[in-house]
Amino acid sequence: MLLTVVLCVNYNQIEKIFYPTEYSEYVEKYSNEYKVDKYLIYSIIKTESKFDPDAVSPKGASGLMQITEKTALWASKELNIKDVDIYDPETNIRMGTWYLHRLNKEFKGDLSLMISAYNGGSGNVRKWLKSSEYSDDGKSLTQIPFKETSQYTEKVLKNYRKYIEIYVYSK
């Protein structure tokens, strides 16, 4: 019995190594400010950069949340940020979380649509929702035509469920 309890406790600690909550001071701050679930933010960071603040994608997205130059310019104007350093963890998390907040409002809290839009663009998601080929009801997607976005959405949702399991249900 004691061995079972020890194994369960240790297993949860081991899982936390693979699902970290690094940069928690910034994630907590901007999660609260922009009303975005902190475990969604961690899931995006894990998927996008594996918590590497210097990560750069082949498409030129940068930092922890893989912010594109276009999004960084838009966010810096909206948030009145001068001298943007996209590799600065706080700035990157602030911009990424602000963008998730915008997507949350646009897609009325639908996680799958938010995540798909974060990767594939909100314009594409709106277009797919209008197409009977990709949506039965105009509110959700039956399929995502971009393979990368489809795989990305599944991966972020899987990571999100795991973060919830580890940090919410295993307390």
Protein language model features and the residues they cover:
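N-terminal Sec-pathway targeting helices
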Residues: 1-4
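Catalytic glycan-binding domains that act on GlcNAc-containing polysaccharides
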Residues: 7-171
